[in-house]
Design a protein with these regions (language model features):
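C-terminal binding/interaction regions
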Residues: 157
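Channel- or pocket-lining gating/hinge segments that regulate access to a cavity or pore
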Residues: 163-165
Length: 216
């Protein structure tokens, strides 16, 4: 695992979200949730975009053979809730290959199997109807949209019980530095309030609000 990915595994999405706000970056994927609150993922995006099926039907899930261990499959199904693009077979292959997890702007199915294999899937929802003959892969390895957030191949994806955030790779070091600073301030505030300092005083003393405010 890359050192920077390992560092991000230790920071929750709430703190990273605050760091993104501080830097004026939209990276929070609204509505994308974990199918188990116990999962935490961090890795680089392998992007896939689906579109409506054409007259000459294309592939649905063969791209999984090209995903590297440690990567996160990021699927743009344009937020469709009426058919799935991920189920038990894909889950089994991904788990066997050592893929870190899957993020879908759309739905998954075979949830019991996903939970049984303990393979992290983050999605808009769950629905049993197949995507076969309804959608097909339009592109692989190009920029996609997840809940209106742009994701490019290689961007860092973080997911946990509170949702999913996207970190553009060109500013990943800066986001990490700000997140660590915010995390440190929050730790100091907790310690100070446990010793009797008021929350207002602690937040002021450790410049907490400025750490979350863009441009300050």
């Amino acid at each position: 695992m890359e050192p920077i990915i390992e560092s991000f595994t230790k920071i929750d999405t709430s703190t990273i979200s605050d760091a993104l706000d501080k830097l004026g970056i939209d990276g929070q994927c609204f509505g994308i949730q974990s199918n188990s609150v116990s999962w935490k993922i961090a890795g680089r995006a392998f992007t896939v975009k689906y579109g409506p099926v054409s007259i000459e039907k294309g592939t649905v899930g063969d791209f999984i053979d090209d995903v590297k261990p440690g990567e996160i499959v990021v699927i743009d199904n344009q937020g469709r809730l009426d058919c799935t693009v991920w189920g038990d077979i894909m889950t089994g292959v991904a788990k066997h290959k050592g893929i870190t997890g899957t993020v879908i702007d759309g739905v998954c199915r075979d949830t019991n199997r996903i939970l049984e294999l303990d393979y992290p899937v983050f999605s808009s929802s769950r629905y049993m109807r197949t995507g076969k003959d309804r959608v097909q892969v339009d592109s692989i390895g190009e920029a996609v949209s997840i809940a209106n957030i742009r994701v490019r191949p290689g961007d860092i994806i973080i997911g946990d019980a509170d949702g999913v955030v996207v970190i553009p790779q060109e500013i990943e070091e800066k986001v990490l530095a700000v997140a660590i600073e915010i995390e440190g301030a929050e730790h100091q505030i907790r310690l100070a309030t446990e010793k009797g300092m008021s929350l207002k005083e602690a937040r002021s003393y450790f410049n907490y609000h400025s750490l979350q405010t863009k441009g300050e």
